[in-house]
Amino acid sequence: MDQHTLDVEDTADARHPAGTSCPSDAALLRDTGLLADAALLSDTVRPTNAALPTDAAYPAVNVRDREAAWPPALNFCSRHPKLYGLVALVLLLLIAACVPIFTRTEPRPALTITTSPNLGTRENNADQVTPVSHIGCPNTTQQGSPVFAKLLAKNQASLCNTTLNWHSQDGAGSSYLSQGLRYEEDKKELVVDSPGLYYVFLELKLSPTFTNTGHKVQGWVSLVLQAKPQVDDFDNLALTVELFPCSMENKLVDRSWSQLLLLKAGHRLSVGLRAYLHGAQDAYRDWELSYPNTTSFGLFLVKPDNPWE
């Protein structure tokens, strides 16, 4: 090695004495005032060893330690909390405004009540003819009035075999007799003038008397419907009530019977009372027809018999 080469090496050693190294990038950044970035780079700079000629001759190399913790990432939310709060508030307002739109229902129509026209402005219908139905319960005569009768037992309390007499005048209790029917009191018969299908009913009401104290009387009491002429296909037109010794504990014993009968014009109907009681002397005096809950007999027209139909 010549003398010139030795002089050059001595000059290099004189500028970089032993134990020193070239200033790192971290030192330069620290001198310029970027402290945070200098600290970051200082963690990643491999330490130099001035004793080694290679370290003194070449600049330091940044090497990341795999086991060292990475610096925390920059959190955008932490830097802008007010912006995120404003966005959340706007979303809540939008949701509150949309809820009524999707939950809106159609209003229910108002209830409409149809009332009858004012009587003062009613039209004159005197010249119009209203048709009368021929099927109903009860039905009507040609004049439009219902054919109906209800007769109440008259002047009869004791139980004996007889034909009952009836109240037929309006106002006598609940008795009623319409057109198309008439009652002949002397014969005790109800006469049918309007032919057709009739609903006929009987109601028998009995009460114990004050002499019925022995609890021994028993038997039966009947109401028998009698028709002139006889009604076809009906053999049993009777209402029967059975009485027992214990029956006197009831203040009222009542039974009813009904039947649809086809009656012709001129048919005559009457009701017979039949009784059979035994078990004590004068047993027939222990029971009587009730009053004011009165035994009744009646009928009404269901369907008229019109030959031209």
Curated annotation (Swiss-Prot):
Glycosylation sites recorded in the entry for this protein: 139, 161, 293
Keywords: Cytokine, Glycoprotein, Membrane, Signal-anchor, Transmembrane, Transmembrane helix
Membrane topology qualifier: Single-pass type II membrane protein
One Pfam family matching this protein: TNF
GO cellular component: extracellular space; plasma membrane
Superkingdom of the organism of origin: Eukaryota
Coiled coil: none
Compartments in which it is found: Membrane
Region (Disordered): 1-20
Family affiliation: Belongs to the tumor necrosis factor family.
Assembly notes: Homotrimer.
Protein name: Tumor necrosis factor ligand superfamily member 9
Organism encoding this protein: Mus musculus (Mouse)
Phylogenetic placement of the source organism: Eukaryota, Metazoa, Chordata, Craniata, Vertebrata
UniProt gene name: Tnfsf9
